[in-house]
């Protein structure tokens, strides 16, 4: 099958539900728990105190092209947004939004290809991808086109049967495994031979578990069969009764261990193939792109003088990527305004968001580097400053983990 392209404007009608629920919540006609159950499915949550909202902007594969960057820059200036946050799922969040602004931006985002639908709640979340896919020296192959096709396919589940909990899918292009594909709900880890190893039912949090390697040497065009099998597994064996044990990693226990889980997965995969639906992917050659030459060295930092160790060579001759790690993943919003001004005339320039809440500006020419380095100069300087952090309990309404504090402290 050809890649299923999701048209953002097709989701516009859905946002009427979000609009109505948000209005009722801010009028005091809907309680916070009920509102969360609705708003989460649109990538938005009320912040602590219930007087402001967060909006999570889905960026499949962490790709923020110039159109999306312009939308973000314009929104920051137009609505005077004072707080933004980069996430570990390679998305960007607007914070401290009032009722009118969150309703407006959720719909306006569709015009530049940003769909917030499914950004929270029990839905497939943003598909994560190694941030330098397609440009990284030494990568096994460019996984990005396949990940984007997977992201579009996963969006079709949003209007399907209710999942037990959220479903996170990740792709990695090298053994560095920056997206933690080996312990996602479903992970595709690239191999040197141009295929994927597939991992299922992994995850962190309470009772963390590595994913079960359910398949090796899976051809790239077959990935949708494995996504569909995972979907069927989650519907069949996920825990709908206890949310604390509803994430996919608990299915390993439910089914009697890793081997039993693998057997059940293969049974679902067989059923999916017998359905007769053609899920074999066909991508245009231009989207797949050329691969790096075998034996190519990994991307390395260049220009180490004057702080230029944030610049990395790409596998495309004469092009560079600039890395920026805002402290706490929460840069001054003006950064995105200034970045757009600095790179809007650079052919092919875009941002790639990373799982550690940093980002790269890619496809820079040598003559572009000084300007990009200047705009991003407020980047972390130490390992401590590169620590990954959520937006914080003073802003969001987190689940309470205080019962874990004492045992954890004692172990340390």
Task: Identify the function of each model-found stretch.
Residues 92-126:
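Hydrophobic or amphipathic alpha-helical targeting/insertion segments
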Residues 63-78, 329-346:
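Short amphipathic alpha-helix segments
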Residues 402-408:
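Conserved small/polar residues in nucleotide/adenosyl-binding loops
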Residues 169-250:
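Mobile "lid/hinge" segments at catalytic clefts and subdomain interfaces of large enzymes
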Residues 131, 136-200:
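Active-site cavity-forming subdomains of large catalytic enzyme subunits
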Residues 239-296:
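Terminal amphipathic helices with adjacent charged low-complexity linkers/tails
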Residues 43-62, 312-329:
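Short glycine-/aliphatic-rich beta-strand segments at the starts of folded cytosolic domains
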Residues 76-81, 110-117, 346-347, 376-382:
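A common structural junction motif
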């Amino acid at each position: 099958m050809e890649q299923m392209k999701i048209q953002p404007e097709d989701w516009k009608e859905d946002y009427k539900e979000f609009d109505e629920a948000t209005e009722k919540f801010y009028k005091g006609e809907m309680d916070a728990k009920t509102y969360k159950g609705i708003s989460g499915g649109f990538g938005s949550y009320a912040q602590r105190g219930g007087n402001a909202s967060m909006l999570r902007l889905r960026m499949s594969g962490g790709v923020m092209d110039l159109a999306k960057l312009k939308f973000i820059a314009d929104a920051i200036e137009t609505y005077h947004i004072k707080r933004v946050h980069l996430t570990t799922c390679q998305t960007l969040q607007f914070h401290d939004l009032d009722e009118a602004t969150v309703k407006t931006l959720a719909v306006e985002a569709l015009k530049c290809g940003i769909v917030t639908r499914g950004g929270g709640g029990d839905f497939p979340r943003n598909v994560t991808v190694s941030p330098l896919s397609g440009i990284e020296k030494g990568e096994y192959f460019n996984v990005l086109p396949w990940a984007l096709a997977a992201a579009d396919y996963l969006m079709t589940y949003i209007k399907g049967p209710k999942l037990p909990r959220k479903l996170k899918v990740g792709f990695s292009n090298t053994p560095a495994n920056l997206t933690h594909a080996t312990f996602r709900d479903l992970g595709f880890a690239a191999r040197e031979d141009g295929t994927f190893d597939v991992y299922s039912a992994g995850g962190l949090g309470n009772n963390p578990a590595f994913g079960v390697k359910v398949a090796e040497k899976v051809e790239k065009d077959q990935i949708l069969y494995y996504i569909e099998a995972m979907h069927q597994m989650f519907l069949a064996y996920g825990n709908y009764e206890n949310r604390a044990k509803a994430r996919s990693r608990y299915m390993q226990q439910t089914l009697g261990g890793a081997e039993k889980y693998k057997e059940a997965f293969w049974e679902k995969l067989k059923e999916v193939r017998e359905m007769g639906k053609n899920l074999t992917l066909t991508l245009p050659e231009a989207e797949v792109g050329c691969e790096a030459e075998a034996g190519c060295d990994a991307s390395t930092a260049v220009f180490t003088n004057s702080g230029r160790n944030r610049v990395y060579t790409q596998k495309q001759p004469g092009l560079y990527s600039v890395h920026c790690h805002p402290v706490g993943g929460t840069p001054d919003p003006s950064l995105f305004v200034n970045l757009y001004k600095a790179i809007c005339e650079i052919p092919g320039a875009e941002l790639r968001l990373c799982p550690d809440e940093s980002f790269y500006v890619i496809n820079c020419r040598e003559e572009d580097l000084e300007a990009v380095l200047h705009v991003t100069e407020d980047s972390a300087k130490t390992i401590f400053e590169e620590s990954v952090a959520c937006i914080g309990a003073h802003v969001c309404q987190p689940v309470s983990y205080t019962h874990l504090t004492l045992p954890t402290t004692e172990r340390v």
